[in-house]
Amino acid sequence: MSFNSPFFDFFDNINNEVDAFNRLLGEGGLRGYAPRRQLANTPAKDSTGKEVARPNNYAGALYDPRDETLDDWFDNDLSLFPSGFGFPRSVAVPVDILDHDNNYELKVVVPGVKSKKDIDIEYHQNKNQILVSGEIPSTLNEESKDKVKVKESSSGKFKRVITLPDYPGVDADNIKADYANGVLTLTVPKLKPQKDGKNHVKKIEVSSQESWGN
């Protein structure tokens, strides 16, 4: 560009600097620069082939929400949120749910628990929810904690809230819990469905409108 004006010379200088910077990137001139690894933008799929959104990386912690198909089972659970957003830091223990003909089977992975006093299980009838909370002990002691180079095991307090389906209902008095090999198994019996309430829909007639015909 050949204009005898300082204004255009200024923009020419900027363009030249940008071109030089781009060439520097192409030649690997910024050797100290390494692009941050990011999750791929390609859609993820669940076990049924349905596309689901990938989790985002907030504050350096991977937010690992449970599959969208389980939204009806899990209530709002602070253990699923990453730390750094005002939520208390806790362990997000995995939960498996099996729907049998006569009962629900819940499996909560809580390794290292040495006493049943470290696990608390409650059934909240008003919300039809099972609340499992407790604490997973650390594998480290005072002597070894300063020598750790890599630690992938989780320890600390946990809490999971599982909402059960309203139908056919559950027999709360006969819920059983068993702990073995690091897995807490809850057996939740279902109530027998009523024969006359197969679809749970009852027709309600509207009355008291004198002008309506029979």
Swiss-Prot record:
Positions where N-acetylserine occurs in the chain: S2
Keywords: Acetylation, Phosphoprotein, Stress response
GO molecular function: identical protein binding; mRNA binding; unfolded protein binding
One Pfam family per UniProt: HSP20
InterPro entries in UniProt: A-crystallin/Hsp20_dom (IPR002068), HSP20-like_chaperone (IPR008978), Small_HSP (IPR031107)
Reported function: Not known. One of the major polypeptides produced on heat shock.
Protein family per UniProt: Belongs to the small heat shock protein (HSP20) family.
Descriptive protein name: Heat shock protein 26
Organism the protein comes from: Saccharomyces cerevisiae (strain ATCC 204508 / S288c) (Baker's yeast)
Lineage of origin: Eukaryota, Fungi, Dikarya, Ascomycota, Saccharomycotina
